[in-house]
Amino acid sequence: MPQAPKSLSIDSDAAVVAAAAADDLVRASSPRPRTTTFTPSRPTVLLTKSWTSATVLPSTTSTRITVGANTSTATDAASSISQHEPSTSSNSTRASTPLPELSPSPFSPQTAVAEALTREQQPAGPSDDSQSRSILPHASDHSTPCNSDQATEVAFHDAADVEPEAVGTTVSSSIHALDLLHRVNDRAAAERASNSESLRSHLSRLSVSRASSKHRSRSNSRDASTQTRALPPAFLGTKQAAPSAASAVTQTSLRDEAKDGDRQLYDTSSAPSHEEEQYPDRKYYILSSAGKPIYISHASLSRRKRRREKRRRQRRAESNESDLNSNESDEEDESSTTQVGVMQALISIFADEDSDKLRFIRRGDLLITFLLRAPLYLVCVSSWNEEPSTLRQHLEYLYLQVISLVSASQLTRLFGRMPNFDLRRLLEGTEGIFDYLVNQLNANETEDDDAEQGQHQVATGGVEAKRAVTDWASCHQWWLQALQPIRITVPNLRDQLTAALQPPTAEAGSSTQPHRPKDLLYVLLCANGRIVTLLRPRKHSVHPIDLLLLTNMVMGSRSIKRSGGSEDAEIWLPLSMPKFAPHGFVHAYVKFLDPESWIGSRREGSEMVGDAKMTSSELAVIVVTGDKDAFPTVSAWISSLVAQPPAHWADNTADDAGDAGDAGSIRTTDIMAKRAASKKQAGKSAKPTQTELASWMTHFQRHILTLCRHLTDASNIEQGSPRVSAYTCAELGLAGLRHFVYRSNSTIQLTSPSLPDPYASDAVHRKRLLTLYSLVHHQIHHPLPASASHSESSSSSTTAPPTGMLNGVFGTPASSHPRLSADTRLKMHLVKSHHEQILGWITSPFELYLCLNPQLSKSAIVAVANSLTKWIKSNENDLFLVNAGSF
């Protein structure tokens, strides 16, 4: 038996302060009290079992709050592992994952202290022997009966890639924050008998994870008391498939919560009464180490929404509630400031002499994740029932977005001179960039602010027409850290655009020809925020995160998009690329293209007839250079790629403005040219034909027009806006396939079709799908480390006893810190719910995530996956940027 941790003396006042701070944060972060209505669309428990088990049962819920920490010794973590399930597949390469025992010994010093504190400070009352410092569900917490024959669980662990977790116990003579939490937890267990909702009771039920820098390790070893995780409802079983057997697919299974004697690792709160409230928007906070707020997502989005509604009311002469909105804004800002203060206080409690870091706090479905990047603190509050590693990845992107606006060296210098520096003033006007990123992370529809300004409106009877501009594929780029180029089926068009964007050679520079910009880094052509083509220097690669942050900055800034409304507008902006040069700045040249103006289809005051037109904010050329004085050179080069139409062409197009509504569309340029050739008017030259049109255009312009015709073709139009994915799963003819995401590991690019209904139209279904994708991705990349005896590839089924797991992972010094390698990761993983099945399949060349019909059999799933990979391989040149240009 492992020895219980030593009990340290505590201060009652310090316990009260810590309890009050945590209680305020949990109360402020919870959207509303939840009812006990069961909703089967949320996952609850992930189970290790064979393929034949595919039962989905309702789960009981609980509002119990659990306590865990990452400072246990490796021996304690190993000794707490319980018996694993005996059922394994014949194709498994390792034994089933053992279940960790999280209940502490009843003879721990914390229990004795709790009893002493209860006798001294709490009035006498009825007690329950079953209530102790444990995360077992209480009988009164369940809203529905549970089935003990079907109630099991599996360890679902947190990622350790960003912040290495602690190994070993830190013992100090001073008051330790973890000891404080243990003592408060023990006392609250005794107080729970009287059903009192005190501050100490709330803190005792918090699930806290922390990491200590004193014992940091690069290994992926985890504490068994904190790495377990319950999935959202309706999911089915997992086991590892043999690397050589593609048909051996793992499967997860949904079970009820455990009865008395079974170990429930994490309780889930009751489902909300309305299905729409299942996935409320995550709340993201960025604050300084001094506690000053820098960015608060829900407050910024609310202000943005109020401004949009105010503009609408002003146009409709209905601005009668301005005072009410201002009061709501003040109350929201005050509440957000209070929450930021509580977060800063909680982080400070754990920032003791050992430099411990608070990682996350869990209460049922509510998860509060922390990311400390001095001098900034980033916090995310979510109730999507997902993994902390997913939220930490989101917070990392927000931090990198800050670094892209203010370099890391400048950030350190500012806060080094003034620790209470207000960074929000320096970042004023960039809220739209963060809002655009948060909307993608939350899978929300993106509002077209240009339409609110009257640039993209259809005034028919005074009713505004809202264009669908949301690209759901942008959500996949973040959790897979890969770019998704636009699919182009026109032969050689991508290569032609790449050749047209080749920078001029340095020797060719003259008075009539442009020079090559100094320190040229990247040249990009983007459509709707998606990469069309890319050029880079030879022997130099570009990180996809840098390009994602760059395109997010361009598409998310209202000022940049407003400036790009004119063909003559050119934007020159400094930025930092965190993965390329985080301590310095580069400069980006942005020019939005307006192909409609090249063929003369625009006129002042004209309406946007036809939905197939590309607007000026959808197509852009971006040039990144390290020379801050290169703007004139870059401007001259890009301007030489876009020729202006002749004067007589502009005059004649105004006379033909009253032709058919589709005459001004790019895809009808051929018809327009033929019609113009037959229309001869006295005193005026004929409108140029297609040959004359091509005579004054550059090669770049002609290729751009071909691209626009392709993107605005009737088969590529979705809900009134160009569809950048350009294909659906229905076009592939694979029965049962609803959606997929394919990541090519060689090119670090991905492809995915457009979301079908109900995922595209219903936010609940869409967010559930993305949550399942992230959970499968986490389980594949961060499984429980296998024992040394099962790390070798084997096709036979073996069942090792718990002692084998102890001796293999923690028993020998050589394997005291087991590492996860590509051989020990899961190859396939299946999650099944009432609505869909999600399959994750990882190999060396690719990663594939499928959304399939829940009634599909395992053999049909394997057939769909194999057929899909063959189709992607045959269309690789259309889906990916295979031959990136270089100079």
From Swiss-Prot:
InterPro entries: FUZ/MON1/HPS1_longin_1, FUZ/MON1/HPS1_longin_2, FUZ/MON1/HPS1_longin_3, Mon1. Residues 67-150, 191-280, 298-338, 784-806 are annotated as: Disordered. Its main location: membrane. Residues 254-265 have a biased composition (Basic and acidic residues). It is a peripheral membrane protein. Transmembrane segments: none annotated. Residues 301-315 have a biased composition (Basic residues). GO terms for biological process: autophagy; protein targeting to vacuole; vesicle-mediated transport. Residues 81-95 have a biased composition (Polar residues). GO terms for cellular component: fungal-type vacuole membrane; Mon1-Ccz1 complex; multivesicular body membrane. The keyword Transport applies. It comes from the Eukaryota. It is found in: Endosome, Multivesicular body membrane; Prevacuolar compartment membrane; Vacuole membrane. Keywords: Autophagy, Endosome, Membrane, Protein transport, Transport, Vacuole. Residues 71-80, 784-803 have a biased composition (Low complexity). The keyword Transferase does not apply. In complex with CCZ1, is required for multiple vacuole delivery pathways including the cytoplasm to vacuole transport (Cvt), autophagy, pexophagy and endocytosis. The MON1-CCZ1 complex acts at the fusion of vesicles with the vacuole, through its regulation of the SNARE complex during the coordinated priming and docking stages of fusion, and particularly at the stage of tethering/docking. Belongs to the MON1/SAND family. This is Vacuolar fusion protein MON1.
